[in-house]
Amino acid sequence: MSCPFFIVKKTAISIIFCTFASMKMKRLFLLFLLVVMANVSALAQYDFLTAHRGVIKGGYDFWVYQPEDYYYSQEHTPVVIFLHGASLCGRDINRSRRYGPLDAIVRGREIPALVIVPQNPGGSWNPKKVLDVLDWTRQHYPCDSTRVYVLGMSLGGYGTMDFAGTYPDRVAAALAMCGGSTLRDVQPLGQVPLWIIHGTADRAVNVRESKKVVSALEAEHNDSRLRYDWWQGANHGAPARVFYLKKTYEWLFSHSLADEGRPLNRTISIDRSELKNAYTDMMKNAPKPEVIDGEEDEL
């Protein structure tokens, strides 16, 4: 008696039965197949948001978002790291979902990437701790290590430039808004396609903080991968809607560590006037990701 074969695909399911000796065996096989199909469907049709607490000794707690098609893409999936601002610091990991990519996903923005969101308990972002989160995620979630991106605003803008400048060989592109850098030497940022956005009327973080980075890179003729926008009259919170724009992620995803010379994409632009329509093309009735609590024991 030959064996049964079954092929399960996302768009179609083909079932080829061999001849069974009894109807009972056939019914048992049908039951087994239904269970398998249900499990594959559960993996393939839903996106997940998992909280990981205490998995890195002395490190950050963090969220990992798995996109809907992750079951199929896995090692081809890009990674987006979001570093939040000071207003979201604290021990409650849910604070980091108040704005940014995770909130955009809940509102209906499709982001086809693993999205990593560390929770900063307070103080400046620590680049090594962010790297620890990235490395832990790579060990537990197959992904494309040549397409790792980081973005953030305010304190997260500082964290974005500090992380990209500390590990330029790990970051395919970075987007830093209304921040600056605490690095003594910002020249390694010249290796990374970097987009800086800052409002000229920012009273929380003066635009001079971003301009210092730009001036330092330009002074060394190290700005071929740098672009920047000074939004006239924009306050500190104005750039927040950038996280909700589709083209933000299109710009990030257009870069790869595998690109020869690592050129900067200057084709995709974001005009301040676009922010008012940041939510208009979202999938309003899209199901929200399933939220899962992760491990709580330290490694």
Give the ranges of each region predicted by the language model.
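A domain-start/cap signature at the N-terminus of enzymes
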Residues: 4, 15, 19, 42-79, ...
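Gly/Ser-rich "nucleophile elbow"/oxyanion-hole loop immediately N-terminal to the catalytic nucleophile
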Residues: 69-75, 123-154, 168
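Active-site-adjacent alpha-helix of alpha/beta-hydrolase-fold enzymes
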Residues: 101, 200-226
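Short beta-strand immediately N-terminal to the catalytic nucleophile in serine-hydrolase-like folds
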Residues: 150-152, 177, 197
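A conserved short beta-strand
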Residues: 170-181
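Short beta-strand/loop motif that positions the catalytic acidic residue
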Residues: 190, 195-198, 202
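Histidine-bearing beta->alpha loop at or near hydrolase active sites
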Residues: 199, 228-238
